[in-house]
């Protein structure tokens, strides 16, 4: 059995009394003071997450733009240096290998940020794609790129919440007010290279900082000493992302779930040159997907968990819950679910089977709480 990994901040989490649990191959903090308190801190003030378990891959070389566009559903070519893009890597069937962020430094250099649970799979898949024939090559040659796997040497913090900008500038002494949503810049922190972006996974304004482990350790210590930023675990990271309808790989996304089914086709640019999964997604978009990801709101106070059955009014199973909570911000029992497309219209009455009892629910938009990003 493979040993659980630890981030550079592991000892600090333990010292703070965090509840630790395995996630994506790492021993990670689930909560410190409690999920509700940490969730509310991010919604109203500021919280910091150790997200050093995420994976990072550098792609460089003269074919870097074409290669990234070949493995990535969004279009990096028109993006300007300093821009981040969200999208997916797709298999030939249109299923999602992973969802990720791409940071464009220039036409010849990109950073790909991938999910912790998929690091090994993604790295192998990306390296395999290097040997594919470049569709633009008249000679039928593979891509001329270098792929550097840097997950082991890059650590990451996410500072999130309406007070994040003030905290980053005043506590960490990092100028960030110039960054707009989904942009980034390269900076120096005590002489060390770092990257800061105005991105996050909470539905609130915030920043993600990538740097060497010793730099991230020092930033964490400053934040803790300041008392202006609550340490937050992965428990509230999940409740926060869920409330604003952001997907989690393994729940709303998977190798056998397509962007059409997950309602993410706005991040699949079918008009760009050939890329992995394009034909399958194009065909499904034209024909219509058999399943669709929807929101559900329950009438009663109950918690629908991942995998629970969704039923129609005739008690026939028509889908399953991908994520469900009693929403902390809205005080409603809600869920995201993958259901038969015939039952996906807003307002459709359905049921969720929780243990041996069924609870009535209604299909609603899957964004249960309004995002508060700074544009």
Region roles according to the model:
Residues 1-24, 28-30, 105-375:
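Conserved, structured C-terminal
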Residues 1-87, 95-97:
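Acidic, proline/glycine-enriched N-terminal capping motif
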Residues 35-44, 90-99, 141-143, 188-195, ...:
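Short amphipathic beta-strand starts and helix->beta connectors
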Residues 55, 59, 92, 97, ...:
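Short coil/turn segments at secondary-structure boundaries
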Residues 80-96, 177-190:
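Conserved alpha/beta core surface patches that mediate binding of polyanionic ligands
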Residues 100-104:
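Conserved thiamine diphosphate
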């Amino acid at each position: 059995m493979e040993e659980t990994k630890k981030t550079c901040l592991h000892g600090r989490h333990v010292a703070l009394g965090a509840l630790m649990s395995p996630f994506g191959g790492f021993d990670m903090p689930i909560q410190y003071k409690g999920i509700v308190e940490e969730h509310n801190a991010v919604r109203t003030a500021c919280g910091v997450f150790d997200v050093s378990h995420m994976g990072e891959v550098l792609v460089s070389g003269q074919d870097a733009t074409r290669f990234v566009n070949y493995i990535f559903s969004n279009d990096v070519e028109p993006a300007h240096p300093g821009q981040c893009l969200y999208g997916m890597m797709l298999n030939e069937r249109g299923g999602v290998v992973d969802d990720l962020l791409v940071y464009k430094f220039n036409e010849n250099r990109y950073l790909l940020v991938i999910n912790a649970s998929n690091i090994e799979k993604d790295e192998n898949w990306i390296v395999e794609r290097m040997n594919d024939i470049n569709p633009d090559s008249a000679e039928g040659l593979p891509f001329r790129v270098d792929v550097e796997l840097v997950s082991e040497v890059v650590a990451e913090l996410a500072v999130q919440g309406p007070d994040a900008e003030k905290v980053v500038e005043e506590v960490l002494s990092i100028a960030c007010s110039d960054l707009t949503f989904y942009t980034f810049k390269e900076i120096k922190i005590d002489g060390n290279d770092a990257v800061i972006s105005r991105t996050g996974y909470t539905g609130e304004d915030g920043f993600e900082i990538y740097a060497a482990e010793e730099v991230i350790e020092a930033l964490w210590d400053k934040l803790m000493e300041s008392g202006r930023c609550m340490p937050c675990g992965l428990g509230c990271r999940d409740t926060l992302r869920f409330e604003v309808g952001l997907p989690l790989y393994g729940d709303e996304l998977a190798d056998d779930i397509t962007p059409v089914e997950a309602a993410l086709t706005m991040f699949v640019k079918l008009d760009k040159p050939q890329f992995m999964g394009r034909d399958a997604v194009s065909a499904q978009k034209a024909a219509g997907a058999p399943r669709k990801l929807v929101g559900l709101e329950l009438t009663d106070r109950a918690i629908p968990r991942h995998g629970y059955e969704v039923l129609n009014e005739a008690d026939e199973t028509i889908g399953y819950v991908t994520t469900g909570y009693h929403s902390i911000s809205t005080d409603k029992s809600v869920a995201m679910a993958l259901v038969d497309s015939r039952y996906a219209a807003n307002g459709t009455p359905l049921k969720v089977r929780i243990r041996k009892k069924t609870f009535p629910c209604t299909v609603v938009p899957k964004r249960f709480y309004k995002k508060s990003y700074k544009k």
